């Protein structure tokens, strides 16, 4: 069952890892409360899963090995690990806090594992669900260093690995992340919402007396469209735009969107004006359309 990791817990996990970054590799070892005590690859991965899960029995407890995953040992599942589906993380219904890669060669030096902590972009960064994550690995010593965090550590999907798992856990408030928690952004959203949906009064000279604040912004925009488009269409029709003239003809015949008698008379009057002032435009329209 998927469990939830608090942000405080995720921060603690990263703090524990940072405190052990740079330790020498310790085959068969296990982390303890002493940050100078090291472990090997599987100890690191399994104990990190226990950290995320809030287990209290992790001190000096290796839990298993790389082969514990391959052999489906119960402890692996008890810690919360599950096999990655064929489609990878994209096929999961959640965004896991930890991803794991394994190489199986029979155990010992012939097997390896590493993980990526997905609850931070980089060491010391804020806790958040990350696309990149922080790689975390214990490997053979290089210049005396075996445990590495981020720089020098393999990612969960390194080409070395061929078996992939994830910790069935999510970060709390995963979908809400930081963006909407930003007070500046929140203020902007409230202001935009107010502009769009607060009701205001009409500023027209012909507004109905006593009408008050009844109009939302989108209604005023629709009103502007309703007022300006007919004016624009009439001007273009008088100048010879037969497409706009056709709109006016339809409205005058009661075939437009609005078919009331007042609307028809308005556009019949416009046609009469065009016939009086620009008869050649109507003649071209009739020639093309075969009549009004």
UniProtKB/Swiss-Prot annotation:
Keywords: Antimicrobial, Bacteriolytic enzyme, Cytolysis, Host cell lysis by virus, Hydrolase, Viral release from host cell. It is an enzyme of class 3 (hydrolase). GO terms for molecular function: hydrolase activity. Its EC number is 3.-.-.-. One of its GO terms (biological process) is defense response to bacterium. Endolysin that degrades host peptidoglycans and participates with the holin protein in the sequential events which lead to the programmed host cell lysis releasing the mature viral particles. Once the holin has permeabilized the host cell membrane, the endolysin can reach the periplasm and break down the peptidoglycan layer. Belongs to the L5likevirus endolysin A protein family. This is Endolysin A. It comes from Mycobacterium phage L5. The gene is 10.
């Amino acid at each position: 069952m998927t469990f939830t990791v608090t942000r405080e817990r995720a921060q603690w996990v990263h703090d524990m890892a940072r405190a052990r970054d740079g330790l020498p590799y310790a085959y068969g070892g296990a982390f303890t409360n002493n940050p100078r005590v090291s472990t090997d690859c599987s100890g690191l991965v399994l104990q990190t899963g226990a950290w995320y899960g809030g287990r209290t029995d992790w001190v000096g407890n290796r839990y298993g090995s790389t082969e514990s995953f391959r052999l489906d040992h119960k402890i692996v599942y008890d810690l919360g690990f599950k096999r990655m589906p064929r489609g990878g993380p994209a096929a999961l219904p959640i965004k896991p806090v930890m991803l794991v890669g394994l190489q199986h060669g029979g155990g010992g030096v012939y097997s390896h594992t590493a993980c990526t902590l997905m609850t931070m972009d980089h060491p010391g960064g804020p806790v958040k669900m990350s696309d990149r994550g922080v790689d975390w690995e214990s490997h053979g010593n290089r210049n005396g260093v075996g445990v590495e965090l981020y720089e020098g550590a393999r990612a969960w999907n390194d080409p070395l690995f061929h078996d992939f798992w994830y910790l069935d856990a999510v970060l709390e408030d995963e979908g809400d992340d930081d963006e909407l928690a930003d007070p500046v952004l929140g203020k902007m959203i409230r202001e935009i919402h107010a502009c769009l949906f607060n009701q205001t009064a009409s500023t027209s000279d012909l507004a109905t007396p006593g009408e008050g604040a009844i109009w939302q912004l989108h209604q005023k925009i629709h009103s502007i469209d309703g007022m300006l488009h007919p004016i624009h269409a009439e001007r273009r029709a008088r100048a010879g735009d037969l497409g706009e003239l056709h709109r006016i003809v339809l409205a005058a015949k009661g075939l437009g969107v609005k078919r009331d008698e007042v609307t028809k008379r308005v556009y019949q009057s416009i046609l009469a004006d065009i016939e009086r002032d620009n008869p050649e435009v109507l003649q071209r329209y009739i020639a093309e359309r075969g009549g009004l």
